[in-house]
Structures are given as C-alpha cells and as structure tokens.
Amino acid sequence: MAGARMKSFSNPDETRTPDKTLMELVDLGSVKAARLTVQPGWSWSSCIKPVVGTDTCQANHVGAVVSGRFHIKHNDGSEIDLGPGDAYVCEPGHDGWVVGDEPCVMLEFDATAAATYAKGE
C-alpha cells in the first residue's frame, strides 16, 4: 500500500443516515475517517441510542469541529462545549447534542469509532 493516501468525503466509501445525522466515511487502510453532520435538535440519546441500544455512547471520539456548536456530557460528570476549530477527545460513556440552530460538522479520526458509530448490530 502506498505511503501516502487520500480520499474525499465528497465520494465516501460508506454513508450512514440515522435521524438528523449524515455520517460520511472514508477508508484509508489502517484508519477510517468520518465527516459527521448533525442537525439542530440532534442528540445522541434521541437519534443514535435507538439504533445502537446502549444507555450512553460507547464510542471513543477523536476529532475536530468544523462548524456549529456541540455539547458533551460524560458519565463522570465532566462537560465540554465545542465550537469551530476545537479539537476533542471523548471517551466511552457520554451523551452529546447540537447547541443552537445551525448544523454541527465534525471530523473524526478514531478508526474504531468511525467504523462502528451509528451502526446497529
């Protein structure tokens, strides 16, 4: 495999569309990357929980916000507000939701999260 690879989110390898969600995935070999666009009114508990069936999100997220605003509340009590330009890590055991009236666009680079997020059994 080539030492340098690229793919475009404009032509994703896979697309997932749970309620108020557009997840576009590209497979770069050892890494899967995702562009996640979530609409106003989106929350993990209302839009993704019905798909995956767990009490909280069990994915590990590593990414950055491109546009919009997002709030994360972790089971350990920690909470963060994210906006454009913010990089984040969020460990399993959390809920999250869009803040405000514009979509939130995030790029994620954790291979496991990108491969399994918003995907039913």
Annotate the PLM regions.
Residues K20, G41, G77-E79:
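Detector for glycine-centered tight turns/loop "hinges" at secondary-structure junctions
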Residues R35-L36, V89-C90, D95, G100-K119:
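A short hydrophobic beta-strand segment most commonly corresponding to one strand
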